[in-house]
């Protein structure tokens, strides 16, 4: 299926339940990589003017192009073309869409998909064009995993669990030998494992010792960071995907791999502090409740949104007395990007009211962050065709990492061999 065919399929699905006349794509001066990705346009193509591509649910797409750059959409279907060189000419062309409803990469609650600039939105509204969010369309187009995507994510997740085990063994070796170990050394070890297993990532993993674990997106400094001390909480957050994968039809492509993203918690010592055990127990309860809630809703045919699941998880943490320790949403959509275009488990930061659908994939990563230390436990879930949740990579090694279960239920110590 071509990108145009897929856009029209999802537009038809949406137009069947709403008054949608088309999906409008636009870019100015090459700024919008999401739009270029969706339309399979080169990311490095040089443009300095605005182009517009309107795809109706059925029929031919329309191109609106600047006279200086008439060929920027030559790779896309659509024989109907309009050209402009002034804003007045652009307005006259757009006026034919007066009273039409067009979807845009814009949403008042989801800045991650809002790539269309406010000035252009105002221009459309001045011409009497009704705009609506393309959030649901984007979810259907890019945020739903195919069978090949899911298998790739499963393989990546299994490798990440193995890497967590190897990394913890590396940490334990330093503990037992009393050789100093800093955060950067652990980070480098993880990146070496990514290379070894032919995985790729968009950023170095989070490795945080002690109080640094209270910063959810802690960055290890180039000088090596903190040296592990007895009793330090260690937070590991790693994400990666395969470099290439099979599309189930014998074609190997970099477009097929889907990310996996997991987080584990350990302590640099042989015993776990009581408060750490208490916090981690709350997090595990909150994390596990997501799959339970999805299963119960699916069995009753009740739709669930990402916002509902996030608020459900938050209520568990708040009830345990740690509401003020929450710093982020419960999870994010996952596809070919680690922060993908599908539904996020978010009812607070950027409320996501899109439904959990078959093929949806997302992280579940509740966190509790104090000034003394922080922690989060993270798994990935995808939804099968019956609406049931599956934990990616759980089948790795029969759901075991040493004596620990997948998902993690107890904090690691240096007595563990994984």
What are these regions (language model features)?
Residues 1-418:
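Active-site neighborhoods and metal-handling regions in enzymes and metal-associated proteins
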């Amino acid at each position: 299926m071509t990108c145009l065919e897929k856009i029209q399929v999802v537009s038809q699905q949406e137009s069947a339940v709403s008054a949608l006349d088309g999906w409008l794509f636009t870019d100015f001066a090459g700024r919008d990589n999401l739009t270029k990705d969706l339309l399979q346009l080169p990311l490095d193509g040089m443009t300095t003017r605005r182009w517009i591509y309107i795809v109706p649910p059925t029929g031919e797409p329309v191109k609106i192009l600047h006279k200086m750059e008439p060929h920027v959409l030559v790779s896309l279907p659509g024989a109907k073309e309009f050209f402009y060189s002034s804003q007045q000419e652009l307005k006259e062309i757009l006026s034919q869409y007066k009273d039409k409803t067009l979807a845009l990469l814009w949403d008042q609650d989801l800045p991650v998909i809002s790539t269309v600039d406010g000035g252009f939105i105002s221009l459309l509204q001045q011409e009497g064009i009704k705009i609506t969010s393309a959030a649901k369309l984007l979810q259907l187009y890019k945020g739903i995993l195919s069978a090949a995507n899911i298998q790739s994510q499963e393989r990546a997740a299994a490798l990440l669990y193995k890497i967590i085990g190897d990394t913890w063994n590396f940490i334990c070796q330093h503990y037992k030998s009393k050789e100093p170990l800093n955060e950067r050394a652990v980070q480098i070890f993880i990146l070496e494992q990514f290379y070894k297993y032919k995985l790729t990532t968009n950023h170095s993993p989070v490795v945080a010792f002690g109080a640094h674990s209270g910063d959810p997106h802690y960055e290890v400094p180039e000088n090596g960071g903190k040296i592990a001390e007895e009793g330090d909480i260690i937070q590991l957050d790693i994400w990666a995907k395969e470099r290439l994968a099979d599309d189930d039809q014998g074609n190997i492509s970099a477009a097929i791999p889907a990310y996996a993203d997991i987080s584990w918690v350990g302590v640099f010592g042989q015993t776990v502090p009581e408060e750490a055990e208490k916090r981690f127990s709350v997090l595990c309860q909150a994390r596990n409740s997501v799959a339970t809630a999805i299963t119960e809703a699916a069995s009753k045919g009740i739709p669930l949104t990402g916002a509902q699941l996030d608020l459900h998880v938050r209520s568990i943490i708040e009830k345990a007395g740690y509401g003020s320790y929450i710093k982020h949403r419960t999870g994010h959509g996952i596809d070919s990007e680690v922060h993908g275009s599908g539904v996020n488990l978010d009812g607070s930061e950027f409320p996501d009211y899109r439904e959990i659908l078959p093929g949806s994939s997302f992280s579940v990563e509740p966190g509790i962050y104090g000034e003394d230390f922080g922690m989060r436990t993270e798994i990935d879930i995808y939804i099968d065709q019956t609406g049931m949740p599956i934990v990616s990579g759980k089948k790795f090694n029969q759901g075991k990492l040493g004596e620990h279960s997948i998902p993690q239920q107890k904090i690691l110590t240096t007595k563990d061999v994984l």
